[in-house]
């Protein structure tokens, strides 16, 4: 495994509310790792077209990357933490980038806004960013200016709940495959300054 660059920005073993009240005392997964079920990528690809080259900068154990490869994409997979898949690279602080690519990922919850901004910054005009985020990412004064400056081209809301699993464990009940959180795909196109469309998928 090639080490591109790593810097520990993720020392975040902190308690956060992650959904309904029955989850309010749960501890965030190690390094904020919640794997995305492959179906989430499948429904995105049914709704949205992407360029052949994809960068997945928070690849975890490759759940998203493998679906993208199955659909014929050339995928560069990186992550701050070595989980046995992809290359080690600090997306927020490294100079590493993939040329002429689109970016598709589920960013760490604590750094979601920073991931969105960084992804838009490193892309070439006309290329896309697709972030799998909680629907409530639309809220907050902190993110308002970001959305005004960088309006998503489209937000795909899942009409059926899609799942994330703590530490990538979808088979174990302790993996927190929970229906308590509503997710959406936020899609930006570099340079787009129009109105954000809202569509339903799944």
Residue ranges and their predicted role:
Residues 1-202:
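Class I S-adenosyl-L-methionine-dependent methyltransferase catalytic core
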